[in-house]
Amino acid sequence: MKNEKIVVLYGGDSPEREVSLKSGKAVLDSLISQGYDAVGVDASGKELVAKLLELKPDKCFVALHGEDGENGRVSALLEMLEIKHTSSSMKSSVITMDKMISKEILMHYRMPTPMAKFLTDKLVAEDEISFPVAVKPSSGGSSIATFKVKSIQELKHAYEEASKYGEVMIEQWVTGKEITVAIVNDEVYSSVWIEPQNEFYDYESKYSGKSIYHSPSGLCEQKELEVRQLAKKAYDLLGCSGHARVDFIYDDRGNFYIMEINSSPGMTDNSLSPKSAAAEGVDFDSFVKRIIEQAQ
């Protein structure tokens, strides 16, 4: 309802702060243009609780990315204050933030996802790894410190960089098309095919504006149905709610591999979730409205 007070949470202190600021501004501008009583709050620093208690919002649109918005702390705070919000629960956010935990759950339920394990100093010193592999922080987003590694020499450098952001995982490299699907509760949107500027969809490819996006993705009807069903099943298995996005690799044999689930996807002009919705005929303002109206 438009007479409800809405706070858009953005910014924060994670490495994805700048992206979050852009997402938050886009969402806030959209809400205000549609007549909502909305204000933005930068979640940086230690004043968030005080700000929320002062503003007393009915709902929060969570446009935080990385640790600040996706590790469960903000969800826990909002749930404690009994404020409806657009992201997943604390428990689900903790799970989806940690790519290894997510993978273990998906593999337990025989969902298609590349094999992975934690990367340690000892493993870096071994030469039994079958290259190429992906090396990335176990927790994090926007493909920050994510590398395609083709040799033991590259592995050492990738490990050093990724370990700056916490525990590091090494993952089987799967070659194929990068596909993503946005979900808002029971609404599963069209798949989007990303042709990255670089060899894979890394940080530069995501935010340079030079990657090519196909929405809809061009999958045949059968494969489109399959990827949507896989996305929704992964979303449900990890206990997601509200707005989330599921990323895949689609190989040349027609197999989909679930790469990760993002519980607080970007909402910038260049972000994938709005493209997924647009392929269904849902423009940005309508998409924002659907997300906030379904806040839980």
Curated annotation (Swiss-Prot):
Biological processes annotated in GO: cell wall organization; peptidoglycan biosynthetic process; regulation of cell shape
Ligand binding (Mg(2+) 1): 247, 260
Purpose of the protein: Cell wall formation.
ATP-grasp domain residues: 103-293
Pathway connected to this protein: Cell wall biogenesis; peptidoglycan biosynthesis
Pfam families in UniProt: Dala_Dala_lig_C
Name the UniProt record assigns to this protein: D-alanine--D-alanine ligase
Molecular functions per Gene Ontology: ATP binding; D-alanine-D-alanine ligase activity; metal ion binding
Catalytic activity: 2 D-alanine + ATP = D-alanyl-D-alanine + ADP + phosphate + H(+)
Similarity-based family: Belongs to the D-alanine--D-alanine ligase family.
Domain of life of the native organism: Bacteria
InterPro entries the UniProt entry points to: ATP-grasp, ATP_grasp_subdomain_1, D-Ala_lig_Van_CS, D_ala_D_ala, Dala_Dala_lig_C, PreATP-grasp_dom_sf
Entry cofactors: Mg(2+); Mn(2+)
Cofactor annotation comment: Binds 2 magnesium or manganese ions per subunit.
GO cellular component, one term: cytoplasm
EC number: 6.3.2.4
Binding site for ATP: 129-180
Stretch forming the signal peptide: none
Organism per entry: Francisella tularensis subsp. tularensis (strain WY96-3418)
Keyword terms: ATP-binding, Cell shape, Cell wall biogenesis/degradation, Cytoplasm, Ligase, Magnesium, Manganese, Metal-binding, Nucleotide-binding, Peptidoglycan synthesis
Residues at which Mg(2+) 2 binds: 260, 262
Cysteines paired by S-S bonds: none
HAMAP family from the UniProt entry: Dala_Dala_lig
Localization per record: Cytoplasm
